[in-house]
UniProtKB/Swiss-Prot annotation:
Record localization: Cytoplasm, Nucleoid
NCBIfam families recorded: PRK00321.1-3, PRK00321.1-5
GO biological process entries: DNA recombination; regulation of DNA recombination
Organism: Shewanella pealeana (strain ATCC 700345 / ANG-SQ1)
Lineage per the UniProt record: Bacteria, Pseudomonadati, Pseudomonadota, Gammaproteobacteria, Alteromonadales
Keyword line: Cytoplasm, DNA recombination
Purpose of the protein: May be involved in recombination.
Stored InterPro entries: RdgC
Family (UniProt): Belongs to the RdgC family.
Cross-referenced PANTHER family: RECOMBINATION-ASSOCIATED PROTEIN RDGC
Alphabetical list of Pfam families matching this protein: RdgC
Name of the molecule in the record: Recombination-associated protein RdgC
Gene: rdgC
GO CC annotations on file: bacterial nucleoid; cytoplasm
Amino acid sequence: MWFKNLTVYRFNKPFSVDPDSLEKSLEDFTFSPCSSQDISKFGFSKAMGKHGETLIHTAGDRHLICATKEEKILPSQVIKEALEEKVSQIEAEENRKLAKKEKDAMKDEITTTLLPRAFSRRSQIRALILPEIQMVLVDSSSAAKSEELMALLRKAIGTLPIIPMSFKTPIETQLTEWLKEGKTPAAFEMQDEAELKSDSDEGGIVRFKQQDLSENEVLAHIEVGKQVHKLALHFGQSIAFLLQSDAAIKRLKFSEEFRAGNDDLGNDDPMARLDADFALMSSELIALINATVEALGGLEDSI
């Protein structure tokens, strides 16, 4: 349940959640496994997995949702080889070249034949809906997968007035200033990893890992015009992460000490422990987002 990445959206119109109403809306788009002829299926599943009973888990004004995707694994090379073999056979038998339309129809036929025998894989993606700060946090490093979940949520509830989180000042400008000055806002501590890019196509990209970012070797790249597009940071004593210039927060890692905050509950009641961990995690993520927004100079005015 502990989030590992954050793709952040903000509501550009006031948004509130009625848990019971949202639960009913999600039920119409519940996940069901692929049939023999389905290439993929995507739908909402229990927010707390096998220990939960509902599609939405709520604590205060914080709401967790989860979606499951099943995809058939049908390698394109397998289809290509089967198609080439069939095309060669028919062209030899009929002594003519097949048209593209005929080949496309054959490809569809081959795909339909192979689908029932294909293996499948499942993945899950979660999101935290936070009306109290008017944001949605998606646990994914992929913008495309995050958008897919938001599209499903929008389809379920009819409207979802969100836009990606963006800031008044370009993030790379702020990150470059922090690295240049060797100082971050009080809530954060700079770690030992950064990626710098030049604005020009010829300038290239340079990456530093496990290196003191205050060294002249690093700062020299800033002097010649490169800007920081990725910077490893630590939030208080709780979260390590990589902040990117596109506002994505990746490689989110909660410290062992922080995750142990509910150890006194034990594991006799898994749902009680999950509920407590959800409250702990969501509170700290809200604190992280609020601190990040403040440190980066505030959100861009919504349009």
